[in-house]
């Protein structure tokens, strides 16, 4: 399977499982799980050929571990990044490291300096434990700025943190006072 096919399939799965399952007639439960057979069938009706083998390659080979298969391998979900209001992952609050990072583009800094980090259309703000991960994320949007987040101080003031299955840290928002541009 070519790298391009796997990458295109990953983008398609992200779109469908995080944002628009109805685009192919897929139903997700409140935890974001969708039936793989229904996914394959819905994709085919919309001109995209998927197979279990290809889906498993994408799930297992994705370096960011964006997707998970159910124990019986009959269902799939995105592990975070949802904008679909019907999906409400039941995540447990977790003690974050003292400092977390967020990568963004310089063009977003005026808004961040005014409003802090907000989830936009997603359910949570995404943070990482490693600067390199934050840099890789931020570079997708232009000239990168790494933001250091004082997670320890946020938690002390009552903010809640969660960690997705793939290690991404999540929180509802990050107010300006907890952000330092590096």
Curated annotation (Swiss-Prot):
Kindly indicate whether the keyword RNA-binding belongs to this entry: no
* MF annotations from Gene Ontology: NAD+ poly-ADP-ribosyltransferase activity; tRNA 2'-phosphotransferase activity
Q: Which GO terms describe its biological process?
A: tRNA splicing, via endonucleolytic cleavage and ligation
This protein's UniProt keywords:
NAD, Transferase
Query: Is Magnesium there in the keyword field?
Result: no
Look up the EC number in the record and give it: 2.7.1.-
| Pfam families referenced in this protein's UniProt entry, alphabetically | PTS_2-RNA
Q: What does this protein do?
A: Removes the 2'-phosphate from RNA via an intermediate in which the phosphate is ADP-ribosylated by NAD followed by a presumed transesterification to release the RNA and generate ADP-ribose 1''-2''-cyclic phosphate (APPR>P). May function as an ADP-ribosylase.
Q: Enumerate the PANTHER family for this protein.
A: PUTATIVE PHOSPHOTRANSFERASE (PTHR12684), TRNA 2'-PHOSPHOTRANSFERASE 1 (PTHR12684:SF2)
Spell out the family assignment given in the record's similarity comment. Answer: Belongs to the KptA/TPT1 family.
Q: Which HAMAP family match?
A: KptA (MF_00299)
| Protein's recorded name | Probable RNA 2'-phosphotransferase
Organism this protein belongs to? Pseudomonas fluorescens (strain ATCC BAA-477 / NRRL B-23932 / Pf-5)
Q: What are the top taxonomic ranks of the organism?
A: Bacteria, Pseudomonadati, Pseudomonadota, Gammaproteobacteria, Pseudomonadales
Q: Which gene encodes it?
A: kptA
């Amino acid at each position: 399977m070519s790298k391009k096919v796997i990458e295109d399939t990953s983008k398609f799965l992200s779109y469908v499982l995080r944002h628009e399952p109805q685009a192919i007639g897929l139903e997700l439960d409140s935890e974001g799980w969708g039936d793989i057979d229904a996914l394959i069938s819905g994709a085919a009706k919309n001109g995209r050929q998927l197979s279990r083998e290809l889906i498993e390659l994408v799930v297992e080979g994705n370096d960011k571990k964006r997707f998970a298969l159910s124990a019986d391998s009959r269902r799939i979900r995105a592990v975070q990044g949802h904008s679909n209001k019907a999906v409400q992952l039941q995540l447990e609050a977790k003690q974050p490291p003292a400092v977390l990072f967020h990568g963004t583009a310089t063009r977003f800094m005026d808004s961040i300096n005014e409003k802090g980090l907000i989830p936009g259309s997603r359910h949570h703000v995404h943070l990482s434990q490693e600067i390199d991960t934050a840099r890789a994320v931020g570079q997708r949007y232009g000239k990168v700025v790494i933001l250091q987040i004082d997670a320890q101080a946020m938690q002390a003031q009552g903010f809640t943190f969660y960690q997705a299955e793939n290690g991404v840290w999540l929180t509802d928002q990050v107010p300006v006072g907890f952000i330092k541009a590096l």
